[in-house]
């Protein structure tokens, strides 16, 4: 995905989406998908269906029919006999304070424990760094409060994007501040399953943004681990020019 190119599609054709997911699940369950040229050389140990994610180059919680979409996909999961197939929603957390959004997300729980994941972005510990990452004047405290509100009702995975800005990473002080935000969420009764620390892996729209090298990303993640009581996992980036 090239972040320098504007999104092509802005509308969701609900019935088309449901039909396409139904057809894809049938291909996967039957094994027919591995006979197609694109997937024929997939190693046997990788031939599995992990999850269905509500994500993409947009914000799922802005979709008015998100709750219906979650229900429809949950029904398809049951139809195809895939009880272990996870449903995942990725969100920037801006709308998690809205009751209609929370009601939609609560539909994830119907499959029982382990049947879903909700990934919420928390990319900063301080307001100045957050504004630089967001590219606009948003309240970091609002994001933290929204995640805490949601995490009291649903298990949440925190996604923390750690890039460089003009060649400099956020530094250890920012990571300690981020730990404070995470502890604020758990201290308010929020259930955080995991923190995913990652860096850029594709070309960003902002030329000032770059990738943190693997060893340095490990150092920053270790600083976070020292100050939180939830698991922290690291996902390395790649140089998109190569």
Q: What feature does the model see in each segment?
A:
Residues 11, 15, 137, 211-218:
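Short, conserved loop/turn and helix-capping segments at secondary-structure boundaries
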Residues 61-210:
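Conserved AdoMet/S-adenosylmethionine-binding subsite of the radical SAM
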Residues 18, 22, 102-103, 127-131, ...:
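Generic detector of well-ordered alpha-helical segments enriched in charged/polar residues
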Residues 1-114:
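Conserved Radical SAM active-site core
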Residues 23-30, 75, 149, 180, ...:
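A generic structural signal for well-ordered alpha-helical segments enriched in polar/charged residues
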Residues 176, 215-242:
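C-terminal accessory extensions appended to soluble enzyme cores
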